[in-house]
Swiss-Prot record:
The gene is rlmF. One of its GO terms (molecular function) is 23S rRNA (adenine(1618)-N(6))-methyltransferase activity. This is Putative ribosomal RNA large subunit methyltransferase F. Residues 1-11 have a biased composition (Basic residues). The lineage of its organism: Bacteria, Pseudomonadati, Pseudomonadota, Gammaproteobacteria, Vibrionales. It comes from Vibrio cholerae serotype O1 (strain ATCC 39541 / Classical Ogawa 395 / O395). It catalyses: adenosine(1618) in 23S rRNA + S-adenosyl-L-methionine = N(6)-methyladenosine(1618) in 23S rRNA + S-adenosyl-L-homocysteine + H(+).
Length: 362
């Protein structure tokens, strides 16, 4: 496990918070310098990732192939002579994920059922590193035993708990409404000794609830994480997948590639089951419900957090949290190449109460 570095302070707003208003901070990532490597160029340079993210720079395909030999047949050179894979090929993407987890996190078994969400690991890891910064800023001497995290919608892939355990030694609970996801995530943990004893799973039996039915009456969590459903309907989700494929095709043609992915062929890497992709009302409705439920567990959770894919949803979420009585709200942006994403974190406890929380954990 890496020794956490002292996080940098995020940007401060010019205006002081008004009385009885939560402290709202927005942090932006800085673009790192260009990396140069010896020998041949390698595709998929990921700029803007967190300094502790293991996926900064280029994919080391020789090392990845060594841990997952099946990946070799999917590695190719693009017109610029850089090694890459066809990111429209679901098998190639799945094998890349397997190799990344084996090489960088020591996860010897990882798999997902066909049609389930196959997440981009570099971006998922960035979320964990940046929420870790939030904790380290308050408690620079943070001990892994002080952190218990809850991942809402853990999915069959179990990515957030995997990164949280292997990088920081935190304990995790993963919840999901889908029994198949719980079953597969449990198999991943059972098959990797370094994950055993650190992650447990709970089935959410009521799809209308998020924290209710998962957080026990006497339980306390340091933080929660979530990758919420993005779309409002199945049709919306299918249209979103098609847009991704169209954009990928255009990018491939621009780079001189001939591969033309189809919707059915790319179901895995752009895919996901119903609960992973959509819910009535889409992302805005889901995170709004999360905000309301979080108030019920204000004294049992130190920091709540969730990704927000649609930038337009940030303002509404902040206003709702302010009305609910959140004492501190952070919007933290993440960059991977040209893609900008963000997560929002909030606490119903003020600075003094959070300090007492950490003291009680010592």
């Amino acid at each position: 496990m890496n020794t956490p570095l002292k996080p940098k302070h995020g940007q401060k707003t010019n205006q002081k918070p008004k009385a009885n208003k939560p402290v709202v901070k927005k942090q932006q990532t800085k673009q790192p310098p260009t990396h140069k490597v010896q020998g041949e160029e390698v595709a998929a340079v990921k700029s803007g990732l967190h300094p502790r993210n293991r996926h900064r720079g280029q994919y080391d395909f020789p090392a990845l192939i060594k841990v997952v030999p099946e990946l070799q047949s999917h590695v190719m050179k693009n017109p610029k002579g850089q090694w890459t894979i066809n990111f429209a090929d679901p098998i190639a993407v799945k094998l890349l994920n397997k190799a990344l987890l084996a090489l960088h996190y020591g996860v010897t078994y990882w798999d997902i059922p066909e049609g389930f969400l196959c997440p981009p690991i570099p971006g998922r890891a960035d979320y964990i590193h940046r929420v870790a910064d939030l904790l380290l800023k308050e408690n620079p001497k943070l001990n892994p035993s002080q952190v218990t995290a809850l991942d809402i919608g853990v999915g069959a892939n179990c990515i957030y708990p995997i990164v949280g355990v292997t990088e920081y030694g935190w304990s995790w609970v993963g919840s999901d409404v889908d029994p198949v996801s719980i079953q597969q995530a449990s198999l991943i943990v059972q098959s990797n000794s370094k994950l055993q004893g650190h992650i447990e799973f709970r089935l959410q039996k009521n799809s209308q609830h998020i924290f209710n039915g998962i957080i026990g009456a006497n339980e306390r969590y340091t933080l929660t994480t979530c990758n919420p459903p993005f779309h409002a309907s199945l049709a919306d989700a299918q249209q979103g997948t098609q847009r991704k494929l169209t954009n990928l095709q255009a990018n491939q043609r621009k780079k001189g590639r001939l591969a033309t992915p189809t919707l059915s062929h790319s179901r895995l890497n752009f895919g996901g089951q119903k609960a992973e992709l959509w819910c009535p009302g889409g992302e805005a409705a889901f995170i709004g419900k999360m905000a309301v439920e979080s108030q019920q567990f204000a004294q049992q959770v130190l920091w709540f957090s969730t990704l927000i894919s649609k930038g337009d949803n940030v303002r509404g979420m902040k206003k709702q949290l302010e009305k609910l009585g959140a004492q501190s709200i952070h919007v933290i942006e993440m960059a991977q190449g040209q893609k900008i994403s963000r997560f929002i974190a909030w606490s119903f406890q003020n600075a003094e109460q959070r300090k007492l929380w950490w003291q009680a954990k010592c």
